[in-house]
Amino acid sequence: MVIVVFDLLPRVGLKPRDYLLRIVLPALITSIVLILLGFMLFSGIILYIYLLLPIIILVSAIGYPYIALDSQKNKINERLHIFITKFGTLSITDLNRKDLLKILSEEREELGELAKESEKLYVLTDKWGRSLAEACRFLAQRTPSSEFADFLDRLAYALDSGEELKEFLIKEQDIVMDDYAAFYKRMLYSLDMYKELYVSAMTSIAFFLAFSILVPFLLPYNFVFMATIALFAFFAVELLIVVVIRNRLPFDRLWHTGEKPTETDIKLRKWLIISVILVVILLPFLLWAKYIVGLSPFSQMPYMILVALGFTPLAIGGFVALKEEEKVKRKEFVFPDFLRSLGDSVSAKGGGMVSSLEYLSNHDFGPLTHDIKRLYKRLALGIDSNKSWRLFGFDSCSYLIQLFSDIFSRCIYFGGDPKTAAEIISKNFRKIVQLRKSKYQNIQQFVGVVYGLGGGLALALFASLGVAKMINDLYSSLSIPETVIHILNIAPISNVDVVEYIIFGSLIVYSIISAILIKIMDGGHKFVSLLHFVAILWICAIVAYITKLIVSQVLGVSVPLY
């Protein structure tokens, strides 16, 4: 196994010395320190559970080349659609093969790992004097992605057969896009797996939280201490799941990556600031009215509803962001039609880009029409073509439109045929949009699961708390000798309300992390998570209050319900 690990190091760009000194040695030292601390601080079953941590760290360090190689494979596959579209459209220009590879190797932001693979092809052909076919075969044996390796093998065979690069890449579009579609569908399957993982983890943590509420009646542990430990464990597990899912999901963002904020970005920030200001004003006022001055009707409101009401203004910024996100999706839906129409019009008029845009700007392309008119005005004023198209992509707020409109403009700039370029880009773009529809449906199911799970957590935790309060009231009403109290650990607990606040705090943590996770999985705008946070928090608050009300009636616990 050691030999296999060292054989993989060159493929992930590591020397054996760097691997041992930068990864294995720090992991080994950390594991030893953790093991020593474990033997000093813990014993029994807790020690065995704790020792899993240094073992995981050490195994991860040893298996780092496998992890890095798998990560490279995913990063290559997730950009295949961009690579084949850019490669195909640029191949119909006047660029020679070396210049084409050089351009691809410089697109680090757009192509990621595929830019590095293109750089290897460029170095092999330019510096080492290899033919493109030989370079493709050499790289196909070393790339971690089987899909990309198959593409390189097909390219090498076509070039050896005397086929033109342009003709091959135009025919290859459907094949590579089918490979990308298969990869995307596997990603959707992994989303289902992550949903199951999240539900299982949250169910287990809910059981642990419920157990931590009742265990002080059975074992000599402090009530508040157990609840606090459970809260931190809850937070740590949720955060770990988010990190794992974020690192495993392929890159598929919706929003643009422009450095300067667009009008839409400024609008969203304005509404976010308004929402935050309202929360800063409303939440302290509600708490002051209830707990300090006892102002009616706030003093009679349950604190769960009060907190949810205080955070509700955040939904304003989230709702505005959701509307803009839906508008971006509609823009992506009509973009292929616009580009195909533009390509046909420019080709028919013999290269009149400005006149074609003037004609198309009078047609209805939904929410994209405004951006098309701005593009026409920029080009009519003589602004640089590439810059105008780049600004068009940013104004659309769509990452896909940003990328593919830039590909189209560069193809035209280098002398490519507008009609052919538009056909390649629009066809591939349409396939990506169709794949995304499946993902959005999958995410909607996950949103329903998260909302329902929030209610389930609130029900389980506050039901357990109601039982704990009943037992506590029972012990308080009994005259038990002090000797028996110390033997059986049945002393009444005086800080039950603190534990209740800690439990509700765990539901707030769940609402925050779940809302963030939803946007990580769908790749949308992060501000929309505010709307999900408020919705989940309201569900948790309402279910918690109703559960507390029902438990108090069923078990006869005389506790204040507000």
Curated annotation (Swiss-Prot):
This protein's species is: Methanocaldococcus jannaschii (strain ATCC 43067 / DSM 2661 / JAL-1 / JCM 10045 / NBRC 100440) (Methanococcus jannaschii)
Keywords, alphabetical: Archaeal flagellum, Cell membrane, Membrane, Transmembrane, Transmembrane helix
Signal peptide per UniProt? none
Q: What is any one of the record's Gene Ontology cellular component terms? A: archaeal-type flagellum
Topology class, membrane: Multi-pass membrane protein
Provide the protein name: Flagella accessory protein J
| Localization per Swiss-Prot or TrEMBL | Cell membrane; Archaeal flagellum
The source's superkingdom equals Archaea
Q: Which residues cross the membrane?
A: 32-52, 53-73, 199-219, 225-245, 273-293, 302-322, 446-466, 498-518, 527-547
Instruction: Name the protein family.
Output: To M.voltae FlaJ.
